């Protein structure tokens, strides 16, 4: 019997680790922890382009702590996480969130798996995450939460969202 609070997903394949997931994510718990790598590829993203590797790296990063300036794999900040995820498929993204927002192909609508999403936080600079599916994305949220999955439908993220960049075809 699972005694974890509803906001946590039991990361059963990673003994001793839990991942904080926000935004009502029963879908994501099933998606990530019950064979997501075998799911049908998203339009424009094939297994050859690194989808399976990215999913594996997302799984490995969930629950890791947030440390400013960290690039993984033991800890991450937001742009360090994105850089580390993409390094696994041989792409070298810029180190800073602001710079990640100035490279790649601009995307405003029709987000796809792997798109780097950008947020402008008032008085706190830029924040990045990687879009997964539906409205969900993975990001290094901060010291209290570490690497988590959140929803773009959450009020905070809807207000801060500034667009996305596509690195996968």
For the regions a protein language model found, what residue spans apply to each?
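N-terminal export leaders
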Residues: 15-22
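C-terminal segment of N-terminal export signals and the immediately downstream linker at the start
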Residues: 32-60
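Solvent-exposed, polar/charged alpha-helical surfaces in well-ordered, non-transmembrane soluble domains
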Residues: 52, 56, 60, 80-87, ...
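Catalytic cysteine-centered active-site loop
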Residues: 64-113
């Amino acid at each position: 019997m699972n005694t974890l609070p509803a906001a946590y997903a039991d990361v059963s394949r990673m003994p001793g680790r839990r991942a904080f997931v926000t935004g009502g994510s029963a879908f994501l718990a099933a998606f990530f922890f019950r064979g997501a790598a075998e799911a049908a590829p998203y339009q424009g993203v094939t297994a050859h382009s690194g989808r399976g590797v990215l999913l594996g790296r997302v799984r490995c990063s969930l629950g890791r702590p947030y440390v400013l300036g960290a690039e993984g794999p033991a800890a991450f900040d937001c742009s360090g996480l994105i850089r580390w995820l993409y390094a696994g498929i041989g792409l070298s993204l810029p180190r800073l969130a602001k710079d990640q927002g100035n490279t790649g192909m601009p995307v405003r609508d029709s987000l796809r798996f792997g798109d780097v999403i950008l947020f402008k936080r008032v008085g706190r600079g830029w924040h990045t995450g990687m879009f997964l599916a539906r409205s969900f994305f993975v990001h290094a949220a901060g010291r209290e939460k570490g690497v988590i999955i959140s929803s773009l439908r959450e009020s905070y993220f809807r207000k801060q969202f500034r667009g996305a960049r596509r690195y996968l075809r």
